[in-house]
């Protein structure tokens, strides 16, 4: 057993969350005029665009509600979550409880509700806030959204799907991954527990029996929606190591919930195969996208190093170690921990950078934008704090 000071690691992540990350979002992201949150924040927290992206609205509600429920009953956190939820409730969705992709500052829709992930993060937000407030209204909203997600699951984009029907129908890995996590989030408020278990079973089957390719040691981002088979095209060859590792720690939680040690061991084994494939052996860090055959990429950002990829991977590795004691997981966590704090942490301003080039140099100094908001950094800091603290108790 190596001498790793888990208590010091836990303290470092807790301090970063409480003193650096959360104050940044509380101070700079809240729109005190129209409600909701600004996510387009520059390095120093100044707002550079006022459009509101519904994924990130829901994620920030969830974040502060979750911390209120699990860390401390901080009234500032709860007030932040409630005002964001009220904005979403009033402006975020159409009459069918489909959530728009983006709104202008005042809450008028900008982009149609084509993206089902707007629904999934709204569902998580209202479910977590229902726990924090005891509000039956928020619980009912979460249940309505969950039902709508299940209705849309087989054709998530619906009328806004741009693919020509029938030629090459595909389904993507991200949806079962997110639903897998969402199921645990809303367990306490669901009235029909059978639907919950069926949803979890379906997601586990989809991820492990359809998207996961044992001979490749990774999940494919897209497979045929007709028979679940791999497709030899740009989308079909695409792998995203960060997505894989995020899904794997979600499923480790399901393994814990079900007391399934064999499942946990399998997930840890897969996670090690994924990270070994995804790691950039020349410059360090994890590639954003890879082609399963090593063919040229269609996505120009394939070799960038992104904040969420490394944070989610660190969670997967530390959780794998905590659950199984596998030293390879610990080795990878320590390597990722060093990479995160060396490359993504801003030494001059709060919050972390999101986008690096392949060499690990900062590409964009923003702290928030269309895709980066109050989610992966604070959730990751919280998760790694808790996991390290748990490992420290076992020393």
Ranges and model annotations:
Residues 1-395:
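Glycan-recognition and catalytic cores of secretory/periplasmic carbohydrate-active enzymes
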